[in-house]
Amino acid sequence: MILTLTMNPAVDIGYTVETLKMDTVNRTQKVSKTPGGKGLNVSRVLKQLGSPVLATGLLGGHIGAFIKEKLDEVALENNFYPIQSETRNCIAILHEGLQTEILEAGPTITPEEQAGFLAHFETLLKEVDLITISGSLPSGMDEALYATIIEKATAVGVPVLLDTSGKTLKIALEASTKPALIKPNQEELAGLLGVPEATTV
């Protein structure tokens, strides 16, 4: 089984309007609300391909309950660790061929919740053959958390695929135990190497 980690999931809300007008009311008949986050996108694709997959991460509040409900509706197996703070929304407004996004920062995780999640993860680790880690960490979490997860998984022979960026990625790559694979885009790779992003004409 493949375990997917989404530590900072969201409800992706899409609003479609013909024209986005500033400083006034905009009305829409087209609204979509779906569980979001890179790891959940990975989970959906794996399920479509027929691979056994288990989604985990952090969920809290009414928004977290909505995400779990929607995953259960499509029989996407999940076992998230509960937190006190509310899971975030990410809003996309589609207008005039453009997309304007409003991204909430997300919850702040306590040290006790981080420790609880790691214990939860170690329980799930006994059931899986491969782990994917996708996306950012929420506020309050140790930036070395992914490195810790990679170390714990590798110690029991479970490879980890890592898709993140910034300092979290740098710490994971500088740790003694490395991920089996990383997936940086051009901008992330340039930042990791400390060089200007390449451009094409």
Task: Name each region found by the language model.
Residues 147-201:
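Conserved phosphate/ATP/ADP-binding segment of small-molecule kinases
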Residues 24, 48-128:
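Conserved N-terminal subdomain of the carbohydrate kinase-like
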